[in-house]
Amino acid sequence: MAPQLLLCLILTFLWSLPEAESNVFLKSKVANRFLQRTKRANSLFEEFKSGNIERECIEERCSKEEAREAFEDDEKTETFWNVYVDGDQCSSNPCHYGGTCKDGIGSYTCTCLSGYEGKNCEYVLYKSCRVDNGDCWHFCKPVQNGIQCSCAESYLLGEDGHSCVAGGDFSCGRNIKTRNKREANLPDFQTDFSDDYDEIDENNFVETPTNFSGLVLTVQSQNATLLKKSDNPSPDIRVVNGTDCKLGECPWQALLLNDEGDGFCGGTILSPIYVLTAAHCINQTKYITVVVGEIDISSKKTGRLHSVDKIYVHQKFVPATYDYDIAIIQLKTPIQFSENVVPACLPTADFANQVLMKQNFGIVSGFGRTRERGKTSNTLKVVTLPYVDRHTCMLSSNFPITQNMFCAGYDTLPQDACQGDSGGPHITAYRDTHFITGIVSWGEGCAQTGKYGVYTKVSKFILWIKRIIRQKQPSTESSTGRL
């Protein structure tokens, strides 16, 4: 009986197996849905594994600390977290005029391009010529709702409306160091006289003959005698402890020769037929010859001689104080420009006062004495001198510093200009263009402690200069003599 009962139980178990299998194992579609919904539990030693952004923050919600572990970088973590928390606030491109958007939590920040401001860079800033010269390379003029840039003679305004492109090989103010620039077609020679103001009567000049022996021009008379030495300022302006100005580095330098062929004053080339100098130089000789392109007067290899046609001396020149110490020499034949002979650029009055004379340094050059009571230099010397504020300038001098003058030089360093440099250029460079800012005028000794060189302030005479140099345009041919 027992064996029969055991057999019956075995048969019953085998008959029930298919039904049990169908209850234990799910169909494939149901099983797949179940697996897709299953979340991963933290595995063993997970805290010791390197971060993974997909595992930490995409498969399940993460904390900022976990995101930092995944990125291992604070900036990347912040960028991710700002979007992760509440979406990308920059997706709508809220920043105008090329501004850059940075997402935040519940907000965003726009970094605006220059000239724009506001939360969305929606406001266009009003540019001012008083701030960085309005980004102009040369001249800046206020206009309605902004500024307008323009360029010096022989330059073209760039496509960006700010830069100035040299219009030829020998554009003004470019020495041999700054000549390797992009060139453009040179427009016809012309001068704009409309934008300059001047505190001085434009017609205040006296035209002199080429033979001006014993002539000192004042407001009252052209027939005064030669200036006598007294307790007046000394026209001993001078380049002391300067360096040699190599060929082409001071191409606007002119040298005035007396009737014996000796150099006695300097000058600045303004145009093919006009040279700027000091009024006090005019009474020092019977005849004047102008030399350009020379750097070594002992060799006489590179210079060109030019005869003088007319000389214009400011009618208000005061020999006793050197006020209005400015004159213009008109040549009989035009200067032939080259790499070594180039005019200095003439600035506008505003540009000179607000930009150039607020630079740290100016450049003075000449053939004058290299030390007080020393010999004149055979080679052209150049020195870089700092501008001196007006209050310091006036306190340092025993003589009047008028509104038509400014000081430059060092308080203690032995660098200055010296006798024989009078009338020469004080140049200021701005964006690789060199502008005439002063005329070497007078000083108390040479490079003396606590004393500075005094210069005629060219910005006071811009219109006066232009009224003269526009009277005659240069001829198409030049005729010059060799030294």
Swiss-Prot record:
PROSITE patterns: ASX_HYDROXYL, EGF_1, EGF_2, EGF_3, EGF_CA, GLA_1, GLA_2, TRYPSIN_DOM
Glycosylation site list: 92, 283
Record PTM: Gamma-carboxyglutamate residues are formed by vitamin K dependent carboxylation. These residues are essential for the binding of calcium.
Signal peptide positions on this chain: 1-20
Propeptide residues per the UniProt entry: 21-40, 183-238
GO biological process: one example: proteolysis
Tissue specificity as recorded in UniProt: Plasma; synthesized in the liver.
Keywords: Blood coagulation, Calcium, Cleavage on pair of basic residues, Disulfide bond, EGF-like domain, Gamma-carboxyglutamic acid, Glycoprotein, Hemostasis, Hydrolase, Hydroxylation, Protease, Repeat, Secreted, Serine protease, Signal, Zymogen
The reaction(s) this protein catalyses: Selective cleavage of Arg-|-Thr and then Arg-|-Ile bonds in prothrombin to form thrombin
Keyword Metal-binding set for record: no
Subunit relationships: Heterodimer of a light chain and a heavy chain; disulfide-linked.
Functional note: Factor Xa is a vitamin K-dependent glycoprotein that converts prothrombin to thrombin in the presence of factor Va, calcium and phospholipid during blood clotting.
Family (UniProt): Belongs to the peptidase S1 family.
Protein name according to UniProt: Coagulation factor X isoform 1
Organism: Pseudonaja textilis (Eastern brown snake)
Gene from which this protein is expressed: F10
